[in-house]
Design a protein with these regions (language model features):
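Short beta-strand micro-motifs in enzyme catalytic cores
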Residues: 48-50, 95, 167-171
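Terminal substrate-recognition subdomain of acyl/acetyltransferases
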Residues: 5-9, 24, 28-29, 102-106, ...
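Conserved long hydrophobic alpha-helices within structured protein cores
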Residues: 58-73, 113-120
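Conserved acyl-donor/pantetheine-binding loop and adjacent beta-alpha core of acyl/acetyltransferases
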Residues: 64-101
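Short, solvent-exposed loop/turn segments that connect beta-strands within catalytic domains
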Residues: 55-58, 72, 131-134
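Conserved acetyl-CoA-binding loop-helix of GNAT-fold acetyltransferases
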Residues: 104, 110-126
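Polar/charged side chains located within well-ordered beta-strands of beta-rich proteins
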Residues: 21, 63, 118-121, 141, ...
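Short amphipathic alpha-helix that is part of the acyltransferase structural core
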Residues: 1-61, 67
Length: 190
């Protein structure tokens, strides 16, 4: 398994990601993201794409992130409409990160694939920080019980006002992903 990220991702891998996303979220599901929307989301910037592939370059899992401005996030937060989100890419200075989607093929769940993606993501964030690209705040929305576990245990995010009794809803991380990066890389640096 290896991780491919950002601009290294070609159209074939992107199509595999869309296919896997649609296996989990079919068109009749309220969380379905249309193919045209996913392409539009990354047409100007592939910052935030982290794909795990096998030895034959077949996608086995992914994490997608986007960078938004405050007005765009607020519009999404108020409407609940995923399609209003616009990926502006990571810019020098402060950035708002939206942790978008993650998925691992069923046969690879529990294999450590998501942890490897997380390490690649954390390493990339640290590299960007050194170049003057900062994450000032991160947001995510948990739409499944597994998503709740990811945002609370994996990212250690705090619930926002709309989180319901099951944990579904929006979460925030105000430290700019610093603790997450440390956690993901601590066992590598031992």
């Amino acid at each position: 398994m290896r991780i491919i990220k950002n601009e290294e991702i070609n159209e074939n891998l992107f199509s595999q990601m869309v296919h896997l996303d649609h296996e989990v979220w079919p068109s009749d599901d309220e969380n379905y993201l249309p193919t045209s929307y996913l392409h539009r989301l990354y047409e100007n910037s592939k910052d935030g794409l982290f794909f795990a592939v096998d030895d034959e370059d077949k996608l086995i899992g992914y994490q997608t992130l986007i960078f938004v401005d405050e007005d765009n996030f607020q519009k999404y937060y108020e409407t609940g409409d995923f399609t209003v989100l616009k990926n502006i890419g990571m810019k020098k200075g402060n950035n708002i990160l939206y942790i978008y989607t993650a998925n691992i093929k069923e046969e690879y769940q529990g294999s450590g694939c998501m942890k490897e993606i997380g390490r690649a993501f954390a390493t990339w964030l640290i590299e960007q920080e050194e170049k003057g690209y900062h994450v000032s705040v991160a947001y995510a929305e948990a739409v499944t019980p597994a998503g709740v576990k990811t945002v609370t245990s994996g990212y250690e995010m705090e619930p926002m006002e709309d989180v319901d009794e099951t944990g579904l809803g929006h979460y925030i991380l105000k430290d700019g992903m610093k603790a997450y990066c440390e956690k993901m890389l601590e066992d590598i640096n031992l």
